[in-house]
A protein has these predicted regions:
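Short aromatic/hydrophobic helix-turn
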Residues: 95-104, 146-155, 200-201
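Membrane-interface segments at the starts/ends of alpha-helical transmembrane spans
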Residues: 4-16, 105
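Transmembrane alpha-helical segments and their boundary/interface "anchor" motifs
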Residues: 11, 18-27, 38-79, 83-100, ...
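Hydrophobic transmembrane alpha-helices
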Residues: 30, 34-38, 105, 124-133, ...
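Alpha-helical transmembrane segments and terminal signal-anchor/GPI-anchor hydrophobic tails
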Residues: 150-248, 252-277
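Hydrophobic alpha-helical transmembrane segments of integral membrane proteins
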Residues: 55-74, 144-165
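Membrane-interface micro-motifs in multi-pass membrane enzymes
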Residues: 2, 22-26, 109-122, 164-181, ...
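Membrane-interfacial segments
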Residues: 37-44, 72-80, 135, 139, ...
Length: 295
């Protein structure tokens, strides 16, 4: 809102870019639901094996960075961990993050910023393994309708803190997750007419609090619109490269952002944003390279 009122086109564009970035979570959640359904709907693995396997995959990314954060905290020269947190708070935050329970602290963001995504994703893995793996399509559609109704009612009552709490956890993301499962089971071809309508509704959802509730699913339509371009080189190679870096980016980019923001007053917003983007990719690439060496 402040960006729009400023009338500065540059600030408006940068603010929109920053705001729209969080819709990447919608894409990841959709792909998670789609991939889990393809992988496990008809497999013989037990539900507990699925949950443990997914937890281990997340720990592979989280534990090394956790160790680095602890070393940084006790090095005497803090670089990455937030300075306002005492040593005891660091340990409790680490415990919450590694047990995927940090999302219960909806009143504050813990030190690793987007690490909330891993907790939310793990919740979805558990829900899928225990309840959705063998569920009918009617159950999935019922969940979608139920969550949408809940969020719309809460939003209409002005209970935005509750909406935030649900969006900070798996409940708020269940609709787009269930859509991923449904499309995995029943592939569909969507015409350009419906894609165009979806794109228009997505744009409208940016300005309407009720449409915003379903915006995680509406965000799939702009992706579908540009998907033909993504299948062409060199863009396809770039997207595949970024896809491989996605987990590492989630783990590392909050700490890169902290360092860039500490010095961004001396730089124009465009340069600061470009520097942030390049550093995020480089740090994530190095982090992934180190992990692939050990794993």
């Amino acid at each position: 809102t402040e960006a729009m009122l400023s009338g500065n086109l540059r600030i408006i564009i940068l603010s929109l870019f920053s705001f729209l970035g969080h819709y990447g979570v919608s894409i990841f959640v959709f792909v998670s639901g789609y991939g889990l359904s393809k992988r496990y709907d008809h497999s013989g693995e037990s539900k507990w094996y699925i949950i443990l396997r997914r937890a281990i995959q997340l720990w592979k990314w989280l534990v090394p960075m956790t160790l680095l954060l602890i070393l940084d905290r006790y090095s005497g020269h803090t670089h990455f961990t937030y300075a306002y947190l005492g040593n005891n708070k660091i340990w409790t935050d680490m415990l919450f993050m590694l047990t995927f329970t940090a999302n219960g602290l909806a009143d504050r963001f813990i030190i690793a910023g987007p690490w909330w995504y891993f907790g939310m994703a793990f919740q979805l893995y558990v829900i899928y393994a225990l309840f959705l793996r063998k569920s009918s399509d009617k159950v999935l559609w019922g969940i979608i309708a139920g969550v949408w109704t809940l969020l719309i009612v809460l939003s209409s009552l002005g209970l935005d803190n509750w909406v935030f709490a649900f969006r900070y956890n798996s409940i708020g993301w269940l609709p787009v997750f269930c859509v991923g499962i449904l499309l995995s089971r029943h592939p569909v071809h969507i015409s350009w007419r419906w894609i165009s309508l979806g794109v228009v509704l997505f744009v409208l959802s940016l300005f309407n609090r009720y449409l915003w509730v379903i915006s995680p699913i509406l965000a799939l339509f702009p992706v579908a619109a540009v998907l033909p371009l993504a299948r062409k080189e060199p863009l396809q190679n770039v997207l595949l490269f970024m896809g491989k870096l996605s987990a590492a980016l989630f783990v590392t980019h909050a700490f890169v952002r902290q360092q860039v923001l500490a010095h961004d007053q001396a730089l124009p917003p465009e340069i600061s944003g470009l520097l942030y983007l390049v550093l995020c990719i480089v740090v994530a690439w190095v982090y992934r390279l180190c992990l692939t060496y050990f794993y």
